[in-house]
Amino acid sequence: NYLYYSKHLHIILAFPNTWYSNLKPKGQFNNLDSVTKEIRLMMDPNADPYAAAPEVDPNEVPEKFGASDIFDLNQVQLLNAYSCTECGRCTAVCPANITGKKLSPRKIMMDTRDRIEEVGKNINKNGKFVDDGKKLLDDHIQREELWACTTCNACVEACPVLIDPLSIIVEMRRFLVMEQSSAPSELNVMMANVENNAAPWAYNQADRLNWAKE
């Protein structure tokens, strides 16, 4: 039956994909528990700065931030890739794509599906996954595509079965920033300014109203 191995598989998967879609307000990020815990500790005026750190199992694998391959994506994100009918509505409304940038939300989903297929064939051949030296990041989805996204959610709004390419883009960006400290220079400057001046602009808070005196 052609249905099960063609793009028309989405006819079967559209319902569960819609059922498991994210009901949170669009654009709301998922907070990382470990990071939230550290920030609360830093901002707690009653916290003891000299308190001993909690014991950590030396054999425990450190938590990975974000996603660099399909193994880091959740089941709904993987289901999204197979629910896509490649209609292109998402790319048609993407402001980054319209202005000539490299990003195509449709391609993000196709690349994710291609990587899943690649990993599946690897597992079928070897009985388990054997490192093939490839990742979803860089080998399929380029960094230029990720940083072209404005996170406007137009692609999510346009999809008839509520596929969310933005969630994959955000997770891969999170990996780049938090695991590799890799971000466009403009973003690094902005984050440094927020850290130093509590604002994205490169001047002191005391100088904010100087423009009004001129």
Please identify what each model-predicted range represents.
Residues 46-119, 123-124:
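Membrane-proximal soluble helical/coiled-coil segments
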Residues 4, 20, 24, 95, ...:
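Hydrophobic/aromatic-lined pockets within catalytic cores
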Residues 72-81, 107, 116-214:
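Iron-sulfur-cluster electron-transfer modules
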Residues 5-13, 87-88, 149, 153:
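P-loop NTPase catalytic cores that bind/hydrolyze ATP
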Residues 15-20, 34-35, 108-112, 173, ...:
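A glycine-rich phosphate-binding loop feature that marks nucleotide/adenosyl-phosphate handling sites
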Residues 6-14, 106, 166, 170:
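Short helix-terminus and kink motifs of transmembrane alpha helices
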Residues 1-54, 67:
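Membrane-embedded alpha-helical bundles of multi-pass integral membrane proteins
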